[in-house]
Amino acid sequence: MTLQQKIMNSFSGKVVRKDLAFLVKGGLPVPTYVLEYLLGQYCANDDEEAIEIGLEKVKEVIQNNYVHRADAESVKGNIREAGRYRIIDKVTAVLNEKSDEYQASFANLGLTNVPIGTQYVNSNPKLLSGNGVWCIVTLGYIHGEDIKVRWEIQTLKPIQISNIDLQEYIEQRKNFTTDEWLDFMIHTIGLNPEMLNRREKFISLARLLPHVESNFNFMELGPKGTGKSHVFQELSPYGVLISGGDVTSARLFVKMQGNREILGLVGYWDVVAWDEFEQQKGRNVDAVLIDTMQNYLANKSFNRGKATHEASASMTFVGNTKHTVPYMLKNSHLFESIPTSFIKGAFLDRIHLYNPGWEIR
């Protein structure tokens, strides 16, 4: 029995072919996990005819429901004429204290200040993180006179698996050898195990550690184009990737709004990945950010405002190297790419794993 057959037999109805996601994605600016979620609904089997039918259905859903920014006004018109319409968009929520209600904004549709039910925010707190959550939303339009807000969120469902039976995976693991399971895991992150040696497989899988361990501090530096950011941007709806220039203490930890303390990204996500970390080199990095970061990496907590906050988000630092390893070892060190402000024991001693990204071809 081939590995593919064993996977299909052990996880029937849960397997999605990675090549289908790439086939569907094209130039769409959406994470791969959004497409895999849809493929899982229509193409989770090994029957070629059924897969072909399901693939067409997924393409139809994307064509009809995914909101392209260029088509936003057309979609609004469709909602108005039909009265309601289902869309796929990135949704963010905020609390409007003046009106005492939560309000949503839609990244591609361009709508803001749309009332959103408290039940949706309570069950999906990441909506408040400021980074947005990809959702399937049924959006209604209210006709009539003297209507303050015409848009109405009738249903909202985040694009993520709600229930996972971990025990089932533990039981099915017994059906695989260690090497088979290793290759299976490599497949799940979109890589071909036949193109990697055993060490490269483990280096690639090490990128998953921040996803499965709370408060795991991870760093990977390596050449461009080796997939460092992919795992943190495309794989899971529970992690967030932010670029180097967008990192501030307020965004990561706590933002003060009057007398209120608004929790930052570490309070909502399982993994916060700092991309293009090396681009901060030569810039004046906020001293408050460095101090708060070091405290969080060490103690899983941070002090901002009047309170001490605890969080379980893993921190990941991803960046590119400019030189080869032999050059760095001879002329500087393996941390030469990162900002000078972070090259000190108080920061580096708190990194649990420095993944050698330069070994990935």
Placement of each model-derived feature along the sequence:
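Extended, charged/polar low-complexity intrinsically disordered regions
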Residues: M1-T188
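Intrinsically disordered, low-complexity boundary segments flanking structured domains
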Residues: V121-N124, K228, I338-K344
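A generic structural signal for short, solvent-exposed coil/turn residues
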Residues: S129-N131, I153, V212, A307, ...
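Generic structural motif
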Residues: I142-G144, N320-T321, W358-I360
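Generic alpha-helical structural element
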Residues: I170, K174, K281-G282, T340
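Alpha-helix initiation and N-capping motif
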Residues: T178-L182, I290, K344, L348
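Conserved ASCE/P-loop NTPase catalytic core
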Residues: N192-Y327, N331-L334, D349
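A short helix-turn-beta junction within AAA+ P-loop NTPase domains corresponding to the substrate/partner-engaging
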Residues: L329-I360
